[in-house]
Design a protein with these regions (language model features):
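Negatively charged, low-complexity tracts enriched in Asp/Glu with abundant Ser/Thr
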Residues: 1-17
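A general marker of short, structured functional hotspots
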Residues: 7, 12, 45, 52, ...
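Generic detector of leucine side chains in alpha-helical contexts
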Residues: 14, 26-27, 40-41, 60, ...
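Short acidic/glycine-enriched loop/turn segments that link adjacent beta-strands
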Residues: 20-21
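Short aromatic-glycine-(Arg/Gly/Cys) micro-motifs in beta-strand/loop hairpins
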Residues: 24-54, 69-70
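A short, charged, amphipathic alpha-helix used as a generic interaction element across diverse proteins
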Residues: 58-74
């Protein structure tokens, strides 16, 4: 997937969806709580990204489950 860097942390976009309330992304990073489900991911002028809400997970299956649940809730 697409990789971006925020500070010293690389994020890989594992999955992404558009909903009627904006986007949602499943991200992987090589640090504590390596999986993030982020809502309203936005690229900044300096090339970094911000998001409005993030839920952090230690295990990929938990992050994937939450990601798909949120997509269904936001459709």
């Amino acid at each position: 997937g697409y990789i971006f860097r925020n500070g010293t942390i690389d994020y890989t976009v594992l999955d992404y969806a558009e909903t009627r309330f904006g986007n949602i992304a499943l991200l992987r990073r090589d640090t504590y709580c390596p999986f993030v489900v982020a809502r309203l991911l936005q690229k900044q002028p300096d090339g970094t990204y911000i998001w409005a809400w993030g839920s952090y997970f230690n295990e990929l299956p938990n992050a994937e489950s939450f990601f798909h649940t949120r997509i269904n809730e936001l459709q």
